């Protein structure tokens, strides 16, 4: 209830009681403000991801990890890992069942191929579309880019990482590896996560995005 409404609710004879009530409200608000810590993150992506993981209603973290969660570990933002890729659509591909960490087999289709240069080398990654997700409003243009690299099992999660992108209007696509995130399985084994196809292995170190969370 707004403080102005509280003031109107009490009669003059109860003025002292009102002051006490308002004092409690103010002190409580001050206490909460002091306890609330700012969301960590060098970029907007990092701050949004940390905020999502800090929120019990959206976080994949186990209760014991959420209790002391202060933010994910990220590689330092590096513009080297923001690349422009040639986007080749593959409209004749047939849907397939993608393997996951459980017996769940979601239906995907290879939507295209992305070819780009990174640190003086040329790489190609397949990009996919979830055939169930495109039926959800707001995700009609959603594409899924899973990848493996040589930091996996060291600084980053052993099962690889994911990047979310939208279908571009042109035949070019910007890939920001700084926005690479871990599958939920990296935090909690109760989740079912797509296994990164082996053909999406990058034989280089991608020192960008979310790092390994810890032992689970």
Task: List PLM regions with ranges.
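Bacterial Sec-dependent N-terminal signal peptides
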Residues: 1-38
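Start-of-domain marker
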Residues: 35-93
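Extended, aromatic/histidine-rich regions of cofactor-dependent oxidoreductases associated
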Residues: 36-39, 181-216
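Extracellular/lumen-exposed scaffold segments
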Residues: 64-67, 74, 94-110, 172, ...
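Terminal leader/tail segments of proteins
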Residues: 79-81, 93-99, 168, 216
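A mature extracytoplasmic/lumenal domain signature
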Residues: 87, 127-131, 149-151, 177-181, ...
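Mid-length scaffold segments of soluble, non-membrane domains
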Residues: 94-158
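Acidic, glycine-rich flexible loop segments
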Residues: 144-181
